[in-house]
Amino acid sequence: MSMTPREIVSELDAHIIGQNEAKRAVAIALRNRWRRMQLPEDLRQEVTPKNILMIGPTGVGKTEIARRLAKLANAPFIKVEATKFTEVGYVGKEVDSIIKDLTDVAVKLVKSQAVEKNRMRAQDAAEDRILDVLLPPAKDQWGNVQESDNSSTRQVFRKKLREGQLDDKEIEIDVAAQVSVEIMTPPGMEEMTSQLQSLFEGMSPNKTKKRKMKIKDALKVMVDEEAAKLVNPEELKQQAIEAVEQHGIVFIDEIDKICKKGEHSGGDVSREGVQRDLLPIIEGSTVNTKHGMVKTDHILFICSGAFQVARPSDLLPELQGRLPIRVELKSLTKEDFERILTEPNASLTLQYRELMKTEGVEIEFTKDGISKIAESAFRVNEKTENIGARRLHTVLERLMDGISFDASERSGEKIVIDEKYVQAALNDVVENEDLSRFIL
């Protein structure tokens, strides 16, 4: 991650409106990962990540920041829901599985990078295999391959292959047969399932089977096969574990749902027990995964929650201490809604315009129309539950319902969505609180 904090914020701005404080905190945390790697080895071990707690109502951009961060980080990244885990000793997923899943993500990431690195060599080897099918080498009477005298013909075919002239020609090739072993186990035993699957798949011999396919498809399959041959699995595991330990990022959503609310007591195994299990992982411990032992000392944890019923102070004091950076995300205003409808790279209005364009219908959202949509969503949020920007999805879906249904019969038309159109479509539902509670 060599992007500067300003570049990271700029990238997030293209998809998320407002919440500059949260963007800055995340950008600094990401950049600090890179800064730490530039330090001398002895000092590097002493610099631990400053974990983040994002606090804000639902629908203001907490999860979206995580999604965009995953694409930007180019590092092992996993997003989990705190409510999915149970305390050790109960049926359900244990907190350790976060690190196990993160390591699986890292193995896939490192493998894809290694395959990409070897793609040129793999491409040449795959082309040779296809040319061997198209131009079988001559053999002598004892079955030995003779020195080829058709090198010029082979070069002509290689040129055609690279130019795509042979793409639609069908050939029969030998491809590795994928051995698939399905094992059914009770919930909470996913680790045992994956170990048994690996065991049985490792015991089966490497078989090939003949398949007939177009050359362009065969080339993709063969490039992947050849690239996989050039990769050392043991080396990959070591690189993946190092990537997790030095660059891993864990995003834990809905952390407020595992808070102990007030003086509540009882056998709720998904609350305080889960917090206690999270403590050693966030503080730094060693987790045993199927790829090897992983130290969590330098993994960055970003936690988020709405904290509408519970408060951050309801978290265990030790856990609060391990989340030193607090960021509060603001509730969205009508002006924010207007910007969300128009400014992001893939804004909602753009999505609907492009969807209807596939049917030959042109949609135009006027400025006053967008303002009215934003106002309607904001009013419904005020009168009923405030679900933030997610309300725009329900309002727009209601608004576009008729157009979406009739679009295939209205090809060639231009539909202007202005203030009057929005008022006619939404006014009854927005004004009637009972209707808006159930429909919007």
Swiss-Prot record:
Query: What SUPFAM superfamilies does the annotation carry?
Result: P-loop containing nucleoside triphosphate hydrolases (SSF52540)
Q: Which GO terms describe its cellular component?
A: HslUV protease complex
The signal peptide, as residue positions, is none
The organism's place on the tree of life at top rank: Bacteria
Gene3D superfamilies in alphabetical order: 1.10.8.60, DNA helicase RuvA subunit, C-terminal domain, P-loop containing nucleotide triphosphate hydrolases
Q: What InterPro entries is this protein classified in?
A: AAA+_ATPase (IPR003593), ATP-dep_Clp_protease_ClpX (IPR050052), ATPase_AAA_core (IPR003959), Clp_ATPase_C (IPR019489), HslU (IPR004491), P-loop_NTPase (IPR027417)
Among the GO molecular function terms of this UniProt record, one is: peptidase activity
**CDD domains of this UniProt entry?**
RecA-like_HslU
Q: Which GO terms describe its biological process?
A: protein unfolding; proteolysis involved in protein catabolic process
Q: Which UniProt keywords apply?
A: ATP-binding, Chaperone, Cytoplasm, Nucleotide-binding
Note whether Cell division occurs among the keywords.
no
Q: Which residues bind ATP?
A: 17, 59-64, 253, 318, 390
Cell location:
Cytoplasm
Q: Which family does it belong to?
A: Belongs to the ClpX chaperone family. HslU subfamily.
Q: According to its UniProt entry, what is the function of this protein?
A: ATPase subunit of a proteasome-like degradation complex; this subunit has chaperone activity. The binding of ATP and its subsequent hydrolysis by HslU are essential for unfolding of protein substrates subsequently hydrolyzed by HslV. HslU recognizes the N-terminal part of its protein substrates and unfolds these before they are guided to HslV for hydrolysis.
Its quaternary structure? A double ring-shaped homohexamer of HslV is capped on each side by a ring-shaped HslU homohexamer. The assembly of the HslU/HslV complex is dependent on binding of ATP.
Task: Give the protein name, as stated in the record.
Answer: ATP-dependent protease ATPase subunit HslU
Source organism of the structure: Actinobacillus pleuropneumoniae serotype 5b (strain L20)
